Amino acid sequence: MNDLSSILNWIGNTIGNSALGTTATTLKGAIAELADKTSKKTANPGRSTDGIEVDWNETSLTKYDNVVECKLRFRTVATNPMPAGKTLFTFPVGYRPPYVVRPITYDWNLSSVHRFNLYTDGTFKLVDTMPSGLTFIMTFTFTV
């Protein structure tokens, strides 16, 4: 069974590039605590080593019955364009397909040429080269 704590740790460890946990009892509190810890850990809150920066102010977790929806706002911050085939991050075992349902939605800033694939081994990769400076939102829904 997946739980909020492990989802938050995955966000912190894999996407936010920090070892984070939470003691919050509500989803709003968990996001606030996660954002607070991240901002204290790095000069660039949410910055990942692989060219992805998370905007924690636009990040949310919402629980509906047996699913948790995680909405993440990213910005590409790599100095050079990220090449096609680059793995942006890897879902941990408990959150790989088919446990991730409706895995990805994007905001309007992404054109059709900037595509991603989520593979059954849990890797989330670019299909095409992506320039720096793009902002996009992805929504993942986890079963819990």
Predicted regions: what is each one?
Residues M1-A43:
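Fibrous stalk/shaft segments of extracellular and virion attachment machinery
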Residues L27-I31, V68-C70, F91:
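Extracellular/surface recognition and adhesion modules
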